Amino acid sequence: MMPGRVGAINLPTAATLFDTAIGHCAIAWRGATVIRFQLPEASPAATLARIARRRAGHLDEEVREEKPTGVIAEAIAAIHAHLAGELDDLRWIPLDTGEIPQFHRAVYDVTRAVDPGHTLSYGQVADRVGAPGAAQAVGQALGRNPIPLIIPCHRVLAADHALHGFSAPGGIDTKQRLLAIERTSGFGEPTLF
């Protein structure tokens, strides 16, 4: 279960860049809760710029680069290890999802419950959030996921197990790489059953 707003709304937003096995990632947080995560862009500077950009409707938000401590430092260490193949479900990392629309939060809750090495289809996620037939809406919600990897949208596939669209930098190649790191089998090729 992901916590919503945890009293961090009035705290400043901090961010940092860190190197991983797949390149430089970035994380933004308020207090002890993660609010955004960024997979590697074309350069470390582009990754940091993306995580630091102001969100729509938050013109007063200033993101400052800081050295992480406490649970945020622990989260970075776990992400680093996960991307190096020491798998962690990352569910213990506290998130602030209070500003995310309710349907998206429901989709993210279901998605976050998928263990590394496993996948669901967009339709299965729709069924689990109580919206049968809403696979396209699930895909749209996952395309707007502000905290990829920690909310593992890469673990949601088309019904035929094919890798369709992935809005993170690197697109389908990044999705395929993350699934390979997690030793996920049966993706990328349609099955007969």
Walk through the language-model features, giving the residues of each:
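Short glycine/serine-rich loop segments
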Residues: 133-177
